[in-house]
Amino acid sequence: MNFCSKKKILKQCFFEFLGTGLIIFLGISSLVVSKLTNFHFNHCEISCIWGLGVFISICFCSSVSGAHLNPAITIFLFLSSQFNKKKVIPYILSQISGTFFFTFLIYLIFNNLLNSFESKYNIVRGTKKSLELASLFCVFPKENYNFIHDFILEILIGIIFIIILMKLSEKNNLFKFYKFINPFLIGTLVIIINLFLTSYSNITLNPARDLGPRIFLSLIGWGKLAFTGDDNIIFPYFLIPTIAPIIGINLGGWIYILYIKK
């Protein structure tokens, strides 16, 4: 690999780092502000902020890196021979590093508010009570959750998501003539999924969106609870937002290629 190729890959990875991180920065910040200040966003507004983050990030990254912004999509594109294998690991590391770093930035910005909330409600990091605060950064089990149910649901939504995304990205799609329309529609799809499903189940669709913040939480006091979410050591909760989207998006992608693509 020559110098120019390395420089190009480095630039692409940097854009994946920034793009994925920006989604996290906007989305998690809205949750933190709504929870810890007097400025409250409702569920619809928070969903719109997440969708807007996706829209902005795709517009920002697409011309340079292709705007994967998601390890599951990177893996699918590689397995379907649409992406250079030399870029797979750098892209995935960039995406997860981006969410980790921007979670760190959020923590620095809102550290005083987080500490005040912990003091006010006698919250000790690493205890189950502390999951109320940790859930601002990544997803944790809802009351009476079922591991198998949530895992399968994440897969199913991933299948639907990638099929719609691939259909929107077809070369002969009418929207391809208007560069901002496709990112807007994908952002709108994210808004719809958030609106109708996140209050019922923790749908992430993106391993990096959850794993980066989860790793960060494990380093600042939540420890292994950041990964397990409860007492289930055999099936730790982080497997749902980390592994299920990869399975779902790859299944959906191949369904599209084999049965839908013209």
Curated annotation (Swiss-Prot):
PROSITE patterns: MIP. One of its GO terms (molecular function) is glycerol channel activity. InterPro entries: Aquaporin-like, MIP, MIP/Aquaporin, MIP_CS. The chain crosses the membrane at residues 8-36, 42-62, 87-110, 146-171, 181-197, 235-259. It comes from the Bacteria. It catalyses: glycerol(in) = glycerol(out). Residues 66-69, 70-80, 202-205, 206-219 dip into the membrane without crossing it. SUPFAM superfamilies: Aquaporin-like. Gene3D superfamilies: Glycerol uptake facilitator protein (1.20.1080.10). A motif (NPA 1) lies at residues 70-72. The keyword Transport applies. It is found in: Cell membrane. Residues 1-7, 63-65, 81-86, 172-180, 260-262 are cytoplasmic. Mediates glycerol diffusion across the cytoplasmic membrane via a pore-type mechanism. Aquaporins contain two tandem repeats each containing three membrane-spanning domains and a pore-forming loop with the signature motif Asn-Pro-Ala (NPA). This is Glycerol uptake facilitator protein. It comes from Buchnera aphidicola subsp. Schizaphis graminum (strain Sg). The lineage of its organism: Bacteria, Pseudomonadati, Pseudomonadota, Gammaproteobacteria, Enterobacterales.
